[in-house]
Amino acid sequence: MGHAAGYGMDRPSARRKLKRRDPNRVKLGKRNRRSGRNFERNVFARLTSLGLPVYKVPMSGGLKATGLIPQLKDRMAGDLQITIADKTYLIECKHTSAKHKVVELAESVGACHIKGFCFMFTESDFINYLMGYPYNCTEVEDERHKWLHKYFDQDNSQLVVIGRNYKQNIYCVHESAMEVFSHILDKNGKFINKRS
């Protein structure tokens, strides 16, 4: 049976419904969420192995996104949280396949500073920074880094960990938190809980 003109599958809303129900899109979304959860677990395991007081946020954004419990919004922010000197700082974990020049620069030089924004470290340089050792840093202008600003602004995080397949993680520390995370591990790799 035919449809009257203007009704049926040529309507934008009908096309959107079909697009939403596409099983391949559903599989892709599930796969992305699963890889994101696995990456969060790996970052959690790595940071706790360094002796840092990191804990997971339950449902990592699930309750916050639905807005079911507005009173818990601040407690449910970020993927991971770390407590230093009785203050909680947020860690956002992002696993991506996108290529960004500044990430590749950080991988090649070890550490770079996006002026007025954040510092990016490879894992070995990040550990040196946590222990208070000096590090060489390449200066970069804050241009074309909107994607990284979004990562920090998502939950107002102080630390963003970027993971890519077959590459080492990049740890991005917001300028406002540089003093907080610096020298929180002693020379033996033990956590030092700074008191303000």
Language-model features, listed with the residues they occupy:
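Catalytic phosphate/metal-binding cores of nucleic-acid and nucleotide-processing enzymes, i.e., regions
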Residues: G2-S196
